[in-house]
């Protein structure tokens, strides 16, 4: 059975030859510290200690929505003015805080020291601190570091930096059996759904990175095949490839078409025949297509504008254009990795306006001129646009919410339909 998608108005273009506008100017994005919000829930025995300012602490606390007395698996070592002025030894204070933390929380098996804008400005070497503390607390606790700074980055790069720092700690694969490594944080329910699908297809062994426990790190080697579940992990992929792993070219598992292409890439790599693939995936495809049908009437023909924010913009645009018949006014993304997104770019309608980077004032001008039905943007732009009568969808919600796979295809469509329904009720 084939996937039913709305045909494009024009054939897709070669991803290499697509015209992309590159912009550089004032940006409107969160920093990489935001990734801690979903990573601390995913790796259940890890702790994320941000070395930063009170602003860093407020950002994570507000975004996570977790009360401090609940003892979440993240915290901030707050740098005071005397630290920034170099009047105290920040390393001594950091050692004291880490010792206090690990004494109080013996359940921590993996500690990330997370750099921020303030710690990078004063050149605090967290890599040396992590090495020093690892020697002290090994083997009970592994201590690593990465940067969550917002200097020239966007918020999803925090996960990439985190996972890349963990790659050297992955054990080497001991046998020559091919294995599949799915990389990128997924909600546990989505991970379980994919695992059942891989089992039914006869694909295995399958491992997920990041794992739910740091004591169950996946192995990697020359026979490891990488399947990207998130498009914002170039450093992690590069680090895994340096360990010998090979990346599978695939679209991302958003919507029916994306999920089918994603699973097919794995099936082809493991020699699964087409008949088996169709038999296993058909019930899920049919159910997902039926569920999407309820949203086509609401979203079909609606015009959408993507501001660059999460790096999910291109897969989302493909899903909305091909499966829900939405019209793409402009698709902006902070960074465009042409190799990793090649399968997605092939599926975008010809002639769609693509933008890499951000000059927020120019993009706001184009959005106001176009007057789309809905704009996907960061929180900082949402309220001003809503005040101007432009319906918005927060891009960060698309990272926090389980949207991958067949079972979540309709949920993903609803995320875009809901703001339009709300706007219609408000003006009625």
From Swiss-Prot:
Cofactor note text: Binds 1 [4Fe-4S] cluster per heterodimer. The cluster is bound at the heterodimer interface by residues from both subunits.
Q: Does the keyword Secreted apply?
A: no
Q: In which pathway does it act?
A: Porphyrin-containing compound metabolism; bacteriochlorophyll biosynthesis (light-independent)
User: What general EC class does the enzyme of this chain belong to?
Assistant: oxidoreductase
Keywords (alphabetical) are: 4Fe-4S, ATP-binding, Bacteriochlorophyll biosynthesis, Chlorophyll biosynthesis, Iron, Iron-sulfur, Metal-binding, Nucleotide-binding, Oxidoreductase, Photosynthesis
Amino acids binding [4Fe-4S] cluster:
31, 56, 117
User: What GO terms are given for molecular function?
Assistant: 4 iron, 4 sulfur cluster binding; ATP binding; metal ion binding; oxidoreductase activity, acting on iron-sulfur proteins as donors; oxidoreductase activity, acting on the CH-CH group of donors, iron-sulfur protein as acceptor
Please list the reactions this protein catalyses: chlorophyllide a + oxidized 2[4Fe-4S]-[ferredoxin] + 2 ADP + 2 phosphate = protochlorophyllide a + reduced 2[4Fe-4S]-[ferredoxin] + 2 ATP + 2 H2O
User: What Enzyme Commission number(s) does the record list for this chain?
Assistant: 1.3.7.7
Q: Which GO terms describe its biological process?
A: light-independent bacteriochlorophyll biosynthetic process; photosynthesis, dark reaction
Q: Give the cofactors, semicolon-separated.
A: [4Fe-4S] cluster
Q: Which HAMAP family match?
A: ChlN_BchN
Q: What does this protein do?
A: Component of the dark-operative protochlorophyllide reductase (DPOR) that uses Mg-ATP and reduced ferredoxin to reduce ring D of protochlorophyllide (Pchlide) to form chlorophyllide a (Chlide). This reaction is light-independent. The NB-protein (BchN-BchB) is the catalytic component of the complex.
By sequence similarity, the record places it as follows: Belongs to the BchN/ChlN family.
How is this protein organized at the quaternary level?
Protochlorophyllide reductase is composed of three subunits; BchL, BchN and BchB. Forms a heterotetramer of two BchB and two BchN subunits.
Q: What is this protein called?
A: Light-independent protochlorophyllide reductase subunit N
Source organism of this protein record: Rhodopseudomonas palustris (strain HaA2)
Q: Source organism lineage?
A: Bacteria, Pseudomonadati, Pseudomonadota, Alphaproteobacteria, Hyphomicrobiales
Report the gene name. bchN
């Amino acid at each position: 059975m084939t996937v039913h998608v709305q045909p494009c108005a024009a054939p897709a273009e070669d991803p290499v030859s697509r015209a992309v506008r590159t912009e550089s100017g004032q940006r409107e994005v969160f920093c990489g510290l935001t990734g801690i919000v979903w990573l601390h829930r995913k790796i259940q025995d890890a702790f994320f200690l941000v070395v930063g300012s009170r602003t860093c602490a407020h950002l994570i606390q507000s975004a996570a929505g977790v009360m401090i007395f609940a003892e979440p698996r993240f915290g901030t070592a707050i740098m005071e003015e005397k630290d920034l002025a170099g009047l105290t030894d920040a390393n001594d204070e950091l050692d004291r805080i880490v010792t206090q933390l690990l004494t109080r929380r013996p359940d921590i098996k993996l500690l990330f020291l997370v750099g921020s804008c303030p710690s990078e400005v004063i050149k605090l070497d967290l890599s040396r601190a992590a090495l020093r503390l690892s020697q002290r607390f090994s083997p009970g606790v592994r201590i690593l570091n990465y940067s969550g700074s917002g200097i020239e980055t966007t918020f999803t790069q925090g996960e990439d930096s985190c996972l890349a720092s963990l790659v050297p700690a992955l054990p080497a694969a001991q046998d020559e059996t091919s294995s599949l490594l799915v990389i990128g944080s997924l909600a546990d329910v989505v991970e379980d759904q994919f695992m059942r699908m891989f089992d039914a297809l006869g694909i295995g062994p399958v491992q997920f990175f990041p794992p739910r426990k740091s004591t169950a790190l996946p192995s990697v080697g020359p026979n490891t095949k990488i399947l990207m579940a998130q498009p914002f992990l170039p450093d992690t992929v590069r680090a895994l490839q340096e360990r010998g792993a090979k990346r599978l070219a695939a679209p991302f598992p958003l919507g029916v078409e994306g999920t089918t292409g994603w699973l097919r890439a794995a099936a082809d790599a493991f020699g699964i025949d087409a008949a088996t693939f169709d038999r296993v995936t058909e019930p899920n495809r049919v159910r997902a297509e039926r569920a999407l049908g309820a949203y086509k009437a609401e979203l079909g023909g609606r015009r959408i504008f993507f501001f660059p924010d999460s790096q999910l913009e291109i897969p989302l645009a493909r899903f909305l254009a091909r499966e829900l018949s939405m019209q793409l006014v402009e698709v902006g993304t902070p960074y465009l990795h042409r190799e990793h997104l090649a399968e997605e770019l092939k599926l975008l309608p010809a002639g769609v306006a693509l933008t890499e980077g951000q000059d927020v004032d120019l993009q706001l001008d184009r959005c106001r001129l176009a007057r789309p039905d809905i704009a996907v943007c960061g929180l900082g732009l949402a309220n001003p646009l809503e005040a101007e009568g432009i319906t918005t969808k927060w891009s960060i919600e698309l990272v926090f919410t389980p949207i991958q796979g067949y079972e979540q295809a309709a949920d993903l469509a609803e995320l875009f339909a809901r703001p339009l329904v709300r706007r219609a009720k408000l003006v009625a």
